[in-house]
Structures are given as structure tokens and as C-alpha cells.
């Protein structure tokens, strides 16, 4: 239980203690049941809580930190078997090293996370010309730029082309959430939308991408040369 318990929250609704060995999907399910969520996550959620924070897993968003920044307390089992509790107020040195330490201080058996009320994200994925992306990146303080104007922004450049795939994720305002939740309850995604999602995420992003990478590994070649 200490290693893998899917605890909810303690008396403070913003703090969620739990076993460090629990996988992120189970932790997120437990939080969602309480109307809560982690502030930021990485692209994948197959890791344990301890593994994700100890190795510096991060998501996107110029105003958001990695998973380690959400940690507010740890329980560490040292090589000698000693169990120590650490937080910003108690043994802060051990706390800082342990929350992003690759296990050098010992095994994390419990982690307390700072969480937020559950929220919805609106996702927009569009192909853009690379020049347009670079021109509009901006800085974290620029609300009109792609970086500062979105909660989460990332782009993937296709080598040897001038095209990029942009991804923007933004939290919905409470009134927008209510409208979106009602729409999902009454209609849900239609068959066309489900088919489009499957083609984009499974067939193209995963299946076709894997085939291209395997082909490139088996038959490598140099980058294309531009004609003078």
C-alpha cells in the first residue's frame, strides 16, 4: 500500500498524498473522482509517480513547470533502511534532491502532490508553414505569441521540409466547460469524428510513423541534396 496506494487527498484539497509506485493513470483516475487534476503532465503516462518525477518528466507550457515542481512532500527509504519524511519546511535539502534525484537519496515510497481543480483542455492541431511558426513564436511574456499566448504549445518540424505540425492546448473557462460538457453528454463524438481521430492518432501518427522509422533504419540514406 505504501508503494502503490492510490490515495485521494488529505484535509487540504490542494494536496494529494499517495504511494510513489502508483502508475500515473491510476493516480489521475483517483484525482478525477475527487474533481481534481495534476497541473501539468508529459506526453505519456505509463510511468510511476516516482519514476516520472525522479527523471525530470515535463509537459509543455512556458508558465508551467515539470512534474517535480508539483511535489510538496516525499517519504524516502535510504540504503540503510531509514525512513525519512521531507518537505520544503522539513529537511528541505533532502526534499529538493529527492524530487528530481534519479534515486540517489533512496527509494521514494510516498509522494504528496499539489493538485488543482479538474479542468478541460481544448486541443488544436494544425499544419503550418515553418516560417510562420518561427515568426510567431514570441516569448513567454508575449500574449500575442504562440508560446506566451497558449497554456501549452509545441510544434514538430518535418526535416528537409518547410512544414511543421503545431499543437495548442488551452484550458476552457468555467462557462465554456459547462457548454462543452453538455454537448458531450447529449451528442458525444459522431462516427465521422471518431473515424477521423482513429485515422489521425492510430493509423498515421502511430502506424505510419513506425513504418517510416523502420524503413529509414533498415535502408538509411543521407539528407537530400539541393540542386545548385
Predicted regions and their residues:
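Noncatalytic alpha-helical scaffold of FAD-dependent oxidoreductases
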Residues: 1-228
Amino acid at each position: 500500500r505504501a508503494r502503490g496506494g492510490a490515495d485521494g487527498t488529505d484535509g487540504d484539497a490542494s494536496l494529494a498524498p499517495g504511494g510513489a509506485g502508483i502508475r500515473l493513470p491510476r493516480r489521475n483516475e483517483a484525482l478525477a473522482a475527487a474533481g481534481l487534476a495534476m497541473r501539468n503532465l508529459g506526453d505519456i503516462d505509463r510511468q510511476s509517480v516516482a519514476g516520472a518525477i525522479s527523471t525530470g518528466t515535463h509537459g509543455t507550457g512556458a508558465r508551467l513547470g515539470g512534474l517535480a515542481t508539483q511535489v510538496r512532500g516525499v517519504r524516502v527509504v535510504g540504503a540503510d533502511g531509514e525512513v525519512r519524511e521531507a518537505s520544503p519546511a522539513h529537511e528541505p535539502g533532502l526534499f529538493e534532491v529527492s524530487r528530481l534525484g534519479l534515486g540517489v537519496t533512496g527509494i521514494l515510497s510516498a509522494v504528496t502532490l499539489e493538485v488543482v481543480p479538474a479542468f478541460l483542455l481544448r486541443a488544436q492541431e494544425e499544419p503550418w508553414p515553418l516560417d510562420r511558426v518561427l515568426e510567431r513564436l514570441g516569448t513567454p511574456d508575449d500574449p500575442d505569441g504562440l508560446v506566451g499566448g497558449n497554456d501549452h504549445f509545441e510544434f514538430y518540424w518535418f526535416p528537409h521540409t518547410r512544414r511543421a505540425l503545431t499543437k495548442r492546448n488551452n484550458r476552457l473557462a468555467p462557462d465554456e466547460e459547462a457548454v462543452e460538457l453538455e454537448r458531450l453528454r447529449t451528442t458525444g463524438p459522431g462516427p465521422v469524428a471518431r473515424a477521423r481521430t482513429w485515422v489521425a492518432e492510430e493509423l498515421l501518427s502511430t502506424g505510419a510513423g513506425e513504418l517510416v522509422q523502420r524503413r529509414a533504419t533498415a535502408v538509411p540514406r543521407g539528407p537530400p541534396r539541393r540542386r545548385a
